[in-house]
Design a protein with these regions (language model features):
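Conserved C-terminal RecA-like helicase domain
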Residues: 43, 75, 100-101, 110-116, ...
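Interdomain helical connector at the RecA1-RecA2 junction of SF1/SF2 helicase-like NTPases
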Residues: 6, 191-202, 209-308
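Conserved RecA-like ASCE ATPase "motif II neighborhood" in helicase/translocase motors
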Residues: 102-108, 113-160, 168-188, 338-346, ...
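Conserved RecA-like P-loop NTPase helicase motor core
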Residues: 331-429
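Walker A/P-loop
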Residues: 27-52
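Conserved Walker A/P-loop ATP-binding site and its immediately adjacent core
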Residues: 47-51, 64-93, 121-124
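Long, hydrophobic alpha-helical segments
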Residues: 395-481
Length: 481
C-alpha cells in the first residue's frame, strides 16, 4: 500500500482478507457466500477494501498471489465510483489505471479480465439500457459477461456492493430501482443472470447489508469495526460547533459573514501549523448550501450577494477560488462572475478552490477533509440532510488530530434558519448512534451554543469551542486563539 493504515484498519484488513479467502474456497465448490465489512462513517472503508484487494492480488507470506482474482465494485451513482476509483489508485500499489476499469455503455467482453478491478453504477443496468440489451452491435450483454466469469472462475470473482453511501439524497423510487438491480447479483434473475457465488458488502452497519441479502441462503462472514476505534484514531474531528440565532434574528448575510470570518481563521491557523510542522499546505474550504430553484433562477439564494459578502470579509479571491456543484458540467453566470462546476469527487483534490456552492449534491459519498466551515441557507426541515453532511465533513485533513491547536480539531456550521427546536433535530440525528451518519457523540449546551463533542474530547478535557451570535464571533475567535 502507498498509504500507511491505522492500527484498527490493519487489523480489520487482516480479518477481511481471511474471510474473503475462506469464502472464495467455499464459493469454488458452489456454496453461496457473503462477507460483510461494517465500519462507521469516516473509518476509511474504501482504503481498507483497497488493501484487501491488493493482498488477494499480490499474496503475502502465507498465501500465493491469485492471478485469477477479478473484482467488480458496484454503487448506484457514477460520481461515487469515480471518487472510489481515485482513492483506490492513490492508496494501492497493486491497482493502476491499466487494471482499473470504469464500465460504460460500450463495454462488451465475454468475461471480466483476471487481475482487474471494474467499477459499475447500477444506472447502467436499467431497463432498455445498452449494456443489458442484446443487438447486432453487441456480442455479449453485461449479464452474460457476469455469468461467463462466474462459470470460468467462481472462487476468484469478487463482487463488492458499496452499501455505505447509498440512500442519503435519493428518491424512494431510485433507491428501490437500485436495490432491485443489486438483488439480481445476490439472488439471480431468470433469463438474465445466475447467482454470484461471492458477494462482499461494504456498509456502515451490519443491518444494512444483512437486510439486502436476507433470504438469499448465503453464509455470511462479518468483519466489524467499532465506533470507538475510529474515534480514537484521529481520523475524525473531535468537535462540531453549531452557530445559530437565539434572539434578534440576524440576516442570512450576517451569518455568512461570520462563517467567512471563521473560514479565514481556519486558513490562518492551518498556514501557521503547516509552516511550523513542515507539512504540505492545507487549504480549508467554505461550503455554502443554497436554497432550491425559484422559477428561472437556479436558487432562491442570491449567490452574487453571497460572493460579495465573502470577499468583503476575506478580501478579493481569484475566480477559480469559487466553484459550484449545482448543475452537472455547466458553468454558472453569477452577476459579473462565471462560476466553474466541480463534481463532488473533484473538490478535495482541486488546489485552487476555496468556496463551493451546492444544494444536496455533496451528501452522498462526498469526502472532503478540507471542508471546515459550512453555511446553510436552507430551512430547518432539511435537518437530516444537514446531519448527513456533518458526517461527510468531519474527516481530519491530515488523518490525525492536531495537538498544538485544538481549533484545528473542530468543524463549524452556521444555520441561520434553525431555531432551538430545528437545531435539536440535527443534534438528535447526530447523536442517534447511527454509524451511517457519525460515530456516537455527546452533547453539551451553553447559554447560546449547542456544541457536541465525542467522548474522547471529554475524557481528555479538551476545550469546547462555544457557538455565538454573529456579532460576537470575531472577538471570541481572537481570544480563543
Amino acid at each position: 500500500m502507498k498509504l500507511a493504515l491505522k492500527d484498527f484498519q490493519d487489523a480489520a484488513v487482516a480479518v477481511l482478507v481471511r474471510r474473503l479467502r475462506q469464502a472464495a474456497g467455499e464459493a469454488k465448490d458452489g456454496d453461496l457466500q457473503s462477507v460483510a465489512l461494517s465500519a462507521p462513517t469516516g473509518s476509511g472503508k474504501t482504503v481498507m477494501a483497497a488493501a484487501a484487494i491488493e493482498a488477494l492480488l499480490q499474496g503475502d507470506d502465507r498465501h500465493a498471489p491469485d492471478p485469477e482474482a477479478t473484482f467488480l465494485w458496484i454503487t448506484d451513482q457514477p460520481d461515487l465510483n469515480e471518487q472510489t476509483r481515485r482513492k483506490m489508485l492513490q492508496a494501492s500499489s497493486a491497482l493502476k489505471s491499466s487494471n482499473v476499469v470504469v464500465i460504460d455503455s460500450s463495454f462488451d467482453q465475454e468475461t471480466f479480465s483476471p487481475g482487474s478491478l471494474y467499477f459499475l453504477n447500477t444506472q447502467k443496468l436499467g431497463k432498455e439500457k445498452q449494456l443489458v440489451t442484446p443487438g447486432d452491435s453487441r456480442t455479449f450483454t453485461f449479464w452474460e459477461t457476469v455469468t461467463n466469469t462466474v462459470n470460468a472462475r467462481p472462487g476468484s470473482f469478487y463482487v463488492f456492493i458499496d452499501e455505505a453511501h447509498r440512500g442519503m439524497a435519493e428518491s424512494a423510487r431510485n433507491q428501490k430501482e437500485a436495490t432491485t438491480i443489486i438483488q439480481k447479483f445476490i439472488k439471480g434473475s431468470d433469463g438474465e443472470i445466475s447467482k454470484v457465488p461471492l458477494i462482499a458488502g461494504i456498509s456502515a452497519t451490519p443491518e444494512r447489508f444483512n437486510t439486502l441479502i436476507e433470504g438469499a441462503g448465503r453464509i455470511t462472514r462479518p468483519v466489524d469495526v467499532s465506533p470507538e476505534e475510529v474515534r480514537s484514531s484521529g481520523l475524525l474531528k473531535e468537535t462540531v460547533t453549531f452557530f445559530h440565532p437565539t434572539e434578534n434574528q440576524p440576516s442570512d448575510i450576517t451569518m455568512l459573514r461570520a462563517a467567512a470570518q471563521s473560514w479565514q481563521d481556519f486558513s490562518g491557523r492551518w498556514k501557521d501549523y503547516c509552516r511550523e510542522e513542515d507539512e504540505l499546505p492545507v487549504h480549508p474550504i467554505l461550503v455554502v448550501q443554497v436554497r432550491d430553484a425559484s422559477g428561472k433562477q437556479i436558487s432562491k439564494t442570491n449567490i452574487a450577494e453571497a460572493i460579495r459578502a465573502i470577499e468583503e470579509e476575506a478580501g478579493p479571491l481569484d475566480n477559480d477560488a469559487f466553484a459550484h456543484a449545482l448543475q452537472e458540467g455547466a458553468r454558472l453566470e453569477v452577476g459579473d462572475r462565471e462560476l466553474r462546476y466541480l463534481a463532488p469527487a473533484d473538490i478535495q483534490g482541486d488546489p485552487a478552490v476555496r468556496v463551493v456552492f451546492f444544494k444536496a449534491a455533496l451528501n452522498t459519498g462526498w469526502d472532503c477533509p478540507r471542508a471546515e466551515v459550512m453555511m446553510s441557507f436552507r430551512p430547518a426541515k432539511d435537518g437530516t440532510l444537514i446531519a448527513q453532511l456533518v458526517g461527510r465533513m468531519v474527516r481530519t485533513p491530515l488523518a490525525r488530530r492536531v495537538d498544538s491547536d485544538e481549533r484545528l480539531n473542530t468543524v463549524s456550521l452556521y444555520l441561520p434558519h434553525y431555531d432551538e427546536a430545528g437545531l435539536k433535530k440535527v443534534v438528535d440525528t447526530l447523536t442517534s448512534k447511527d454509524p451511517n451518519v457519525l460515530p456516537p457523540a455527546d452533547i453539551e449546551k451553553g447559554e447560546d451554543m449547542v456544541p457536541f463533542v465525542v467522548p474522547l474530547a471529554v475524557t481528555m478535557r479538551l476545550p469546547l469551542w462555544r457557538s455565538c451570535r454573529p456579532t460576537q464571533c470575531r472577538g471570541r475567535e481572537r481570544r480563543a486563539r
